[in-house]
Amino acid sequence: MPKLGIEFDEAAQKQLEVPLGKREIYPSTGKYVAEILREQGVTIAWGVPGGHIWHFVDAISRIGIKLMIFGHEQNTVYAAEAYSQVTQKPAVAFGTVGPGTGNAFSPMQQAYLSNTPIIYLAGGIEQEHDHLYNTIQESICSEFFAHITKWAQRLFYPWSVKQFLTRGFRVAQTAPMGPVAFELGVDCLFMKDEAREHYWGGFFSQHADYVPNWRQEETTSRIKSAAAPEAIEKAAKAIFEAKRPFIILGDYGAWDQATPEIEEFINLTRIPFNTRRLGRAAVSEKHELHHRGFPKFRNEFDMMIPIGLKVGFFDGYAGGWPESVQIAPADEYIWTYVNTKAALVGNTKTVMQQLNECIKRNGYDKVSREREAWAERCKKSMAEATEARTARAYKYGPDHPRYRDNDFLHHGYMSQIIREVNDELYDSAVRVSIDGYTMSDFVMPYLQFTRPASCLTSNDNAGVGHGVGQAIGAAIGDLENGSRIPFLALMGDAGMMNAGMDIHVAVMYKLPIVYLVTNNGGWMPGMKYPWYGPNWDNLGEQDMIETEWMGVKQFGEERPTEMQRFDQMAKVFGGLEGVVCNRSENFREQLKQAYNTAEKSGPVVLDCIVDRHLVNKAVIGPVYTLMYAHLPWEELPLRGKHSRRSVLKRWFPELQKLPEMPIFDSWEPITEKEYGYEPKVDWVR
């Protein structure tokens, strides 16, 4: 056990000639903060220190909690988010007033959208200068965090700190979970506890409204609830009577550690399932009834069973779903746009236990031949889809003319090789952060996971740059749990530009991380081919490729890959290995070697030069087609015209007069005849 600071060591205090408090603040607000974190089982705090918060940051360290110090506050919260998701424990992050809390805003928003329980401890200014904007680093984060946290509270009095923080841990961990922020300003930190003697007639005790270990031995555990018995009976009967049901496992299958119960339910009922985000491998994706995505005959489903799933944008708001049994951790996760036969609300593990017991008690585990036939049909669909995906990926491998003759890779081929290597070396137990936007579309159907909380994303925040911090937080969480299986952060070059310098933290702690960068030279540069032209011709002339502006030739909205060498980060951070991969035939072995290095000695940046022609299929799909609806038809490249003709023909009646123009395949590179005119530089080809 680490040596404690003397303020936490009563035996050592008795040896002092001059009692604590005569020459320093004692007891301090920082002491109270640290004691609550220890009581709640916190072992690590993630942050960037600063003058306004040294009082409590130092105390957190002096009580024996490890400080993980970063260069930028955004990465501290991303790391805390991943750590919490991997360990299923609340995480603590901190940042100073002003720039510190401001930098934490985006990741706090992401944590709110991913329902991650983070306790954020922030600095604050003196109250007497509120809204004058003439003191140093003025901000009131309890105000600007208010709509992206479950609770944001400004604290003024030392004697109220313990009860507020204790409540904060409960609120953060109550479903739907989410971050809580506490602003501990200098008024609170610089105040002596004895001030309460002059407050409200001295009626307040040292720790008002606080009870130590308030739930006794269960203080650090989440409070669990169960579903109504009558709802369980109704749901079990409906599930038994369904002929072609399908399950979607969401995040709370992982959060509630419900793997055994959900797997038993699947085995009892013989219902095929797919998995989403953090819920991927809530039941192993090697289970015989797992189906990646939906089968082609999804219109035949007669019941949908979402378990702990946020049903929203990426699910089409349940459009086309049949009658459903919703299993949710809280009322807020019961969706009113879903045709619902029964709703079961409670801790996922507990509810699934209830449901399994009811199924066995009523003989609902004796499934019909029709259900067995349905299961077999879905198994066959999965096998065929896997075979088709494999064949499609290998089409764009080393034997494809474009990838044989050029020094860059196809995202789809890389996705298949990642799947194969992860399975060969680690039985598909590699955790992965999905960061690069283009790669996210290609790789998601290919990835296979065998342990819960393996697929880390930006959730509905849909940002980039989170993968750097997430990899660090997840790796530390795994090390705490005794695993050194490498973590794979699938970064894009934009995400690396955003957050890459904090890779130094991974280097300092020799963390087993492979930062695989799909480097295509910009913010989705492939979008120019369907929407802007090869030279970014639909932008203003000052932004087109090769135009001179202030004496400098322009690159549109991209940059040549030879100008950004992420492998060269190894020259900045000693202990980091940097590798370039630009040949398909080398990718498999280079990935294996990267894993080997990461596992044995520390992080690797694998800078993969990829085909800039390729786009996430969403770029030529309905939503992006709307986003580009302002561009004049006559100026659109061929692929953009095809997308607009296919998607918006009802909105723009003139489009219906044109011949059918099917949407292009996003896996296919641009052909020479599609350019319409010559690119001004060769690297755009």
Predicted segments, located by residue:
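N-terminal alpha/beta PP-like core and its mobile active-site loop of ThDP/TPP-dependent enzymes
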Residues: 2-365, 421, 484, 512-515, ...
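Active-site flanking residues adjacent to catalytic metal/cofactor-binding acidic residues
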Residues: 182, 307, 327, 434, ...
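Short, well-ordered beta-to-alpha junction loops that form the rim of enzyme active sites
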Residues: 183-187, 250-252, 435-439, 608-611
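Short glycine-enriched loops at secondary-structure junctions
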Residues: 50-51, 73-75, 136-137, 330, ...
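Active-site glycine- and acidic-residue-rich loops that bind
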Residues: 101, 162-163, 251-257, 407-412, ...
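Thiamine diphosphate
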Residues: 129-137, 259, 298, 343-345, ...
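Phosphate/pyrophosphate-binding active-site segments
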Residues: 2-25, 196, 207-218, 222, ...
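Active-site diphosphate/adenylate-binding microenvironment
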Residues: 30-34, 38-40, 48-58, 379-481
